[in-house]
Amino acid sequence: MDIVMNPDRSQWAALCQRNIPNDDAIEQSVREIMDNVKQNGDTALRDYIARFDHFTGPLAPLSEAEIAEGASKVSPEVADAIRRAADNIAKFHSAQLHPDVDIETMPGIRCVQRAVPIQRVGLYIPGGQAPLFSTVLMLAIPARIAGCAEVILATPASDEHPIAPEILFAAKLCGVGRIFRMGGAQAIAAMAFGTESVPRVHKIFAPGNRFVTKAKQLASRFTAIDMPAGPSEVLVMADESARPDFIAADLLSQAEHGPDSQAVAICSSEAQARQVCDAVARFSAMLPRSESIASSLSHSHIIVMDSIDTAIDFVNLYAPEHLIISTRNPWQVADRITAAGSVFL
């Protein structure tokens, strides 16, 4: 990671640039997959799953017995952690429920706002570098609380590597109805258009790679989607009270998502910045996805800024997906943040 010392505001735009690849090259191939699945259903879907996922098993969803068998392989410690996380997520989203708005704006004119559940939703869970069972929880639990009539889940598997037990455990815990072994653009196409084996859904929720994101964008003409997802990113805003090893761990937690991820830290001194840089190098050498992390860190930065006010201005310009505030008075800082996806104090 490079260290940038007190950059002039004229340099900020360049520091805010993301490493977003040009997806024009993949659009044609994704469009062909979408069109083929739309026209030929299971025949096309089976071909793509065999070609890309290396899975030659049935297109039918897993049976209850298969789900139970896979889920039973989760260790008691991990199972307890998943249950605890599920409880916390459910508490938060239950608090988001609100009563109808019902108001008479003038005599005889009644206006009502009412939230109704989407009937059938499709969840896509990536299965590449790590089993993202947390994504199962964060998508399936709100769907259950909202009252969606049916939740189906798609995640890739291969003949040699079945669906991770943690994903099956989380899906079973959350009451997911059907689980399909399919990944990539072909999974998005199947849920968007429906096939003989896969039902068409009314909305797709799907983090994923460039191919999944492009497929969602094309599918949005036919069914609702959550939003296009870019590469994961984090900005850690720290003052002298923050521990350099903690900052490094937070940076790497996003950098390991993929080679296009970006991790940025704002430090209060050059000494702290160099300590963070050293810790990042030390920790990354211990992690299994070192090549992907190295690619991510090649377009990441540690920025030294001389005041908290300047740092806040930069954060609001950068508008990070994930913002971690590691300062003495984090709530006071958070109150001044106007552009960030999720904020952690």
Task: List the predicted regions and their residue ranges.
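C-terminal core of ALDH-fold dehydrogenases
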Residues: 317-345
